[in-house]
C-alpha cells in the first residue's frame, strides 16, 4: 500500500466513507427489523410503497432516458435499490439553497456592448447567432465579448511558464478554482508566488474540490493556506453523511488575475499535467489564455461557485473592473455548466450538439472519455452521414482501464456512420476541445461523458473567428500525425472485454 493510500485511509475521508457505509447498513437493517417485529403485511406494505414511490419518482424525472433505465435497474433490487436512489439519485434544493439560487440570478454584470454584438452577428450569420442565443439563454450569467486576445497552449508545460509570469505581475486579486491540486513542482512554484503576493497586499481566493484533492492534499491543507493569508476553501466538503450532492463535483479549471487575464482548459495544478512526471505516457492537454473583456465572465463564474460553496454574497462590484479592451479579432463566450437544478439545461452538452449539428465541413474532437447518450451519439453520426469530416481522439494509454473499455464500446457505432476514431498513441490525451469548420471552437474542462455533461460543475470558452482557431487547428493536425486511426480490422474486443463493456454500459450514466 502506497503512502498516499494509507494517508487517505487514515484521514477524515476514510472515516467518512466508513460512516456512510454504516448509515447504509443501518438503513438496510431497519427494514429487516421491521419485518421481524411487526406484522408481515405491514413490512410488505412499507416496502411496496417505497418501491412504487421510487419507480414513480424515477419515471417522472426530467432526465435522459439512459439515466432512468440505469436507476430502474438499481431500483429492482429489494430495499437496497430504493435506499440508493433516495441517497444518490435525485438532487433537491433546500430552502436555503433556493434563496441562494435566486440571489445568484440577480448577481450579474452584463457586457455593455453585448446587444450590439449580437445584432451584428445576427445579420452576419443567423445560425451562429442562434447558437449564441442558446448559450446565453441557458447560462444567464454568460455574455458575448469582443476586445479580447487569446493564446492557445497545446501542452500544459507551454502554459506553465506564462502563467507564472502573469501571477508575478498581479496587483489586485487572484482567483483560483481547480479540481485537482497536487504538491510538486507546478503547485509549489505557484504557491511561492501566491505567498509573496499576499504580502504585497494582493487578495488571493482559492477553491478546490474536496474529492478531487482527496488523495493529493492533506485534510487540513486549507488551514495551512489560510495561515499564509490565502482565503482557501474546499468545494462540496466531504462529511460523514450519505447525500447525492457528492455526485456534483467542481471539475472547473479557472484562474483569474486582476480581472484582466484568465486561464482555463483541461490542465489541473499537478506535475503530470506539465509532463514533469510521467503517469500514462505523454500527457496531452491544452489551455487557453484570455486577455481583455471576456475575462469578466471567468471572474463571474468563479464568484458564482464561491457563493454556492460558501453561502457568502460577494460584492460583485468590487471585482467588476473595467478591464481594458485588447486588440483582437473574433468573439468569445466563457460559460458555465453544471447539475440540475442549479442549471436548468445541460449547457455543455447542448453547446457541443449545436456545434456538431451546424458543421458543414469538419468537426474535430479530443476527449479523455467517450461515454455519451443516444442523442449526442446520433448527432455525431448524422454529421458524418451528411458528409462532414468527423474525427474523435481518445487516449491509447488510459488512466482507468475499465472506463477505456466503455469508451471503446462507442467506437463501432460511430465508425459505422463514417466517424473517424483516433487513439493518441504517445499516451493520455486529457484535453477537451472541439473545432468546427475553422469558424468556431470550444476549449475547457468538459469531457464527453455523463459526469461532465450531467453531474459536474464545468466551464469552457466558446470562440468564433478568433486567431486562436489556427493554433487549435495546427494542434489537431499534429495529434492526427502521432495518433493511430482505429478501424474495424485493428479494433477487436476479447470475449471478457465485451462482457465488461455490456455490464458497464448499463451503468454509464453514473460513470
Language-model segments: residues:
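Structural signature of hydrophobic alpha-helical transmembrane segments
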Residues: 37-46
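Transmembrane alpha-helices and immediately adjacent membrane-cytoplasm interface residues
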Residues: 46-118
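Charged, low-complexity intrinsically disordered terminal segments
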Residues: 2-38, 116-511
